[in-house]
Amino acid sequence: RESVEVFEVDPRGERPTASWVGCVVAPAGVGLNSVAALPGDGFVATNFQRPEGELWEWQPGEGWERVPGSITNGPNGVEASSDGAWLYIGGWGTQSLIRISRGRSPVEVESADVGFHIDNVRFAPDGSVLAAGHVGPTADSIFRCLRQGECDGLQSRVARVDPESLVVD
């Protein structure tokens, strides 16, 4: 089954322990990739599909809902602003960081080109968004590296992006 597994971590002992709390089974046909917590007890997750995948939101008592305006080519990493108003998606297929509003109508979608296939997205201590990924001679070269260990010409990259202006460093 495809699911998000939830654990409670207790770091207080000599060794940290993790206790399974429960799980949320994915909607049929959805292959979850990256997950980010939302304020409260909800979360968002990417469905990495090419040419069209999307973001899904889960809330207790409501279940899963496709995030409006989130369809893109290969959504990979995801992060949410601390207030939950903005979602940041690693656009693997578009080689861009995508910012999408949450809870607004109409949905606001903007992106910043980074020039590589984004795999992971996280906030840095200074509040900027770090987008990490890879670039190679072709998009398939990344999959060839993962599957067969043929990694010639493949490079890892990280971009720092301002979460408000979407200016890329």
Short names for language-model regions:
Residues 18-21, 63-66, 107-111, 167-168:
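Predominantly a core beta-strand signature of beta-propeller blades
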Residues 9-13, 58-62, 101-105, 162-166:
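Short loop/turn segments that connect beta-strands within beta-propeller blades
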Residues 96-146:
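A beta-strand-loop signature enriched in Asp, Gly, Thr, and Trp
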Residues 79-82, 86-99:
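Oxyanion-binding "anion nests"
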Residues 3-5, 53-56, 96-98, 157-159:
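A short loop-to-beta-strand structural motif that recurs across blades of beta-propeller domains
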Residues 1-11:
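Acidic, Gly/Ser/Thr-rich repeat motifs that build Ca2+-stabilized beta-propeller blades
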